[in-house]
């Protein structure tokens, strides 16, 4: 299934993402935020889905240590794959100031067609094979420690996305091939970044942020929608 060019559904109709009524004790709950008088939005935690119009869908993971395994009902893995693999097949760790990525096999794992028996450092362009699933690891931006895992062949995540972004310091959306998410259009860039355990964004041109016009950036939440003349995206809970 190719999602390129498809416009994703609006992410404001599910009460688990954008709430029309407050949860219990919302005044004392730091995980919720009143964006307007009518909507209460839930703070981003460790994972989210990003739908970028006319580009695709992405599973974005924020933690430094992630589990990879088979997608099953009730599965607790961070990166669930629809493939013939173990329920907990491998661990992926981000370490050090340089943002080294280490994969630890919990079941048979191949890197560049060579089976690994111990934690192994990943390099830009490495192909990782886990059972019937194949992923390509890339560090697209030289000044960011965030990375990508691109699905090869019939490999799929659940829910379906085009790639996994391993977000460390920043996630850059733009028309440069070194960006983490690339759109093919005129020059424009939106950067997502973490600050004080909050997910924020900044844009090099004004955007509509959750219905607020002419914004240059702000905090993002589950259910947030960001729209500019060239880039539009929405965020959803990854469950």
Describe the role of every protein-language-model region.
Residues 16, 159-161:
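Serine/threonine-rich intrinsically disordered cytosolic regulatory regions enriched
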Residues 1-65:
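Hydrophobic, helix-prone linear segments
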Residues 61-124, 162-230:
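Forkhead-associated
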Residues 52-54, 152-159:
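Short, solvent-exposed loop/edge segments of extracellular or virion-exposed proteins
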Residues 17-21, 47, 105-106, 111-153, ...:
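C-terminal boundary/linker segments immediately following FHA domains
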Residues 30, 50, 142, 149-151, ...:
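Generic hydrophobic, helix-prone segments enriched in Leu/Val/Ile
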């Amino acid at each position: 299934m190719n999602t390129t060019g498809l416009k994703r559904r609006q992410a404001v109709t599910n009460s688990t993402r954008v709430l029309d009524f407050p949860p219990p004790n919302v005044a004392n709950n730091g995980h919720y935020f009143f964006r307007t008088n009518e909507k209460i939005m839930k703070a981003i935690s460790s994972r989210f889905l990003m739908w970028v119009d006319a580009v695709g869908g992405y599973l974005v993971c924020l933690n430094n240590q992630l589990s990879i395994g088979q997608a099953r009902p009730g599965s607790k893995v961070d990166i669930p794959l629809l493939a013939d693999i173990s329920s907990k097949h491998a661990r992926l760790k981000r370490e050090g100031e340089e943002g080294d990525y280490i994969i630890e096999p919990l079941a048979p794992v191949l890197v560049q067609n060579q089976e690994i028996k111990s934690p192994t450092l990943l390099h830009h362009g490495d192909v990782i094979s886990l059972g019937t699933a194949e992923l390509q690891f890339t560090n697209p931006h030289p000044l960011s420690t965030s990375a990508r895992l691109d699905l090869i062949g019939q490999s799929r995540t659940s829910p379906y996305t085009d790639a996994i972004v391993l977000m460390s310091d920043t996630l850059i959306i733009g028309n440069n091939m070194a960006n983490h998410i690339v759109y093919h259009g005129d020059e424009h860039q939106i950067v997502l970044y973490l600050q004080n355990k909050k997910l924020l964004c900044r844009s090099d041109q004004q955007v509509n942020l959750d219905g607020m016009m002419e914004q240059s950036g702000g905090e993002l939440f589950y259910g947030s929608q960001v729209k500019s003349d060239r880039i539009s995206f929405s965020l959803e809970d990854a469950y």
